[in-house]
Each structure stands twice: as C-alpha cells, then as structure tokens.
Amino acid sequence: MPIKVPNDLPAATVLEEENLFVMRQDRADTQDIRPLEIIVLNLMPTKVETEIQIMRLLSNTPLQINVTLLQMSTHVSKNISQEYLDKFYATFDEVKDRKWDGLIITGAPVENIDFSEVDYWDELCEIMDWSVKNVFSTMHICWGAQAGLYHHYGVDKYPLEEKMSGVFPHRALVGDDPLLRGCDDVFWFPHSRHTEVRARDILKNPHLHIIAVSDEAGVGIVISEKANQVFITGHMEYDAKTLSYEYYRDLGRGMNPHVPYHYFPDDDPSRDPLMTWRSTANLIFGNWLNYYIYQNTPFDLNDVGKE
C-alpha cells in the first residue's frame, strides 16, 4: 500500500522512479479507508534527502499512510528556502489540534551544543510534551532520541572522543519484542554522532527498556514501558552513500575524520560502500507501523491519549 504525499512534492518523483507506490493527494482523496496519520518532524538540514529516506521506509508496508511534514517555526533553515517549507511543511500550530497515529522526530547536527542552546529547543519540548497525549507512538532518531530521552526521562548525553561513524553490529536484549521481529541475531545499522547516551543512566529508569545494543556503538534501541516511545540512537534511514557524503564533507572542512567503520570495502573510501542495513531498516520501520501502531491504535483518532 502507498504513502500519501502532496501532488508536487519532489521526493514523490524520486520514490516513483524506484517503483515504490506513492499515492498523490488527488487520488488518495477518493479512497474510502482509514489510513495511518504520521507526522515527520524533519530537523535535518538535508530536507529533501531525509524526506526521501524516511518515506522510502514508510512506503514499504501493506498499510496506507498519510504523511504530514512538520517544520520548526522558531528556526530559520540555511539549506532550503522558506518558500519550500511553507509549501510542503506544516507548522505545529496547524497540527496540534488533531490526534495522530505516529510521529517521527529525526536527528539534527546539533549534538555538540547543550540542548537548551538549540534555537528551537523550547518549541521542540512543546511538541514532545504534546505528543504524549496526542500521538499514539513516537519514533525518535539519533539526536532526536537523545533529545527525547533527556526531555522525558532526564537521560543525559555525553561527548565522544571520536565521532561514532560507521555501520555497526547490534544484538537484541529481548527475544520477543515486536519491534525486532524478523531481525537477524546480529543486525547492522549506521551511526553518525558526536555524543552518546549510556546504558547505566537508562537502566536507572524503570520506565525505559534497552532492547538492542552494540559492543562498539553502545545503546542501539530503547523503548518506553508502554512502547509508545521508541528511541533509535543511529540512522537506519540513511542511504548507502550518506556516510560517504558526510565523510568527504568533513574532510573538506579540514576535520580529519576517521574512515567510517565497517562501511567502505577494505576501509577504502575510493570504493563504493555496500548497504548492509536495508532489510533491518525496512523490518524495524514496518514493525513499528504494524505492531506498535496499526495493531493497537484506536480506529477513532480522537480516542488517542485516552486511558
């Protein structure tokens, strides 16, 4: 089944060229079906690339999904025009009076500064508070996961001596969580971050459960007690060459980055990387949509947040 997007969203054309089922707004309006209503709060500077990456994963399920892109009103983007954002993105004021099945909060390249110094931090906190009663399940990605764990549970982030960049093996700590259903005993996905959350801090909170870890990358996936919040510390949504782009970008900035771990064949940046996490990403996003949302969300969205 498709995701529904605005008629002229550029990401839709890219996804259609990949033979993914994208339903334009005008066709979707004729469907008599209860689709899932998902918000994507896109905090990444690479807006269009992130749209494509997230929507590619959302579209690969049997469920029909309406996607609403959300921008921060208190932040001025340096990498895309406000005209584009106004055309394709909603503001919080435009979505806050509705209930939603799911919310995805992406990462952002701001982990080296304190949360309170992020210019849109207050607005993000308002959105995260609102999500507790108005969204059935929220997925937080990378810095979004760190922000959510800090805001909701007081879990701090810590600076790393070296950027955590690469594709790392993870293992499940639980055998029966639906989010990991179908995953291999060892499953890989990328990390790209300068800070980390630590297991010892998370384990102090009885309302949080670590369900996947990596010996190299640390905490991988955390869920809340009721599984209405998911925190993924890496970037499953990344394309095959995203880490390569970031590596060469940092080289160009004179930052002397380490070659991403377990990524380029023979650690040779001149060779094209293999994408070893595609199935993991599709499984976990699909499981989140199916088991965490579709199987449990109320048919009447107005009932979201009611005990």
From Swiss-Prot:
Classification via Pfam families: HTS
GO biological process, one term: methionine biosynthetic process
Gene3D superfamilies the UniProt entry points to: 3.40.50.880
Major location category of this protein: cytoplasm
Active site, renumbered: C142, H235, E237
A single MF term (Gene Ontology): homoserine O-succinyltransferase activity
TM stretches of this protein: none
Alphabetical keyword list: Acyltransferase, Amino-acid biosynthesis, Cytoplasm, Methionine biosynthesis, Transferase
Subcellular location: Cytoplasm
Catalytic reactions of this protein: L-homoserine + acetyl-CoA = O-acetyl-L-homoserine + CoA
Domain of life of the native organism: Archaea
Residues binding substrate: K163, S192, R249
GO CC terms of this entry: cytoplasm
Annotated site residues (Important for acyl-CoA specificity) in this chain: E111
Recorded metabolic or biological pathway in which this protein acts: Amino-acid biosynthesis; L-methionine biosynthesis via de novo pathway; O-acetyl-L-homoserine from L-homoserine: step 1/1
Its EC number(s): 2.3.1.31
Annotated site (Important for substrate specificity): S192
Keyword Cytoplasm (UniProt): yes
HAMAP family attached to this UniProt entry: MetA_acyltransf
Family of this protein: Belongs to the MetA family.
Known function: Transfers an acetyl group from acetyl-CoA to L-homoserine, forming acetyl-L-homoserine.
UniProt xrefs under PANTHER family: HOMOSERINE O-SUCCINYLTRANSFERASE
Protein name: Homoserine O-acetyltransferase
Organism: Thermoplasmatales archaeon (strain BRNA1)
Taxonomic classification: Archaea, Methanobacteriati, Thermoplasmatota, Thermoplasmata, Thermoplasmatales
Gene designation: metAA
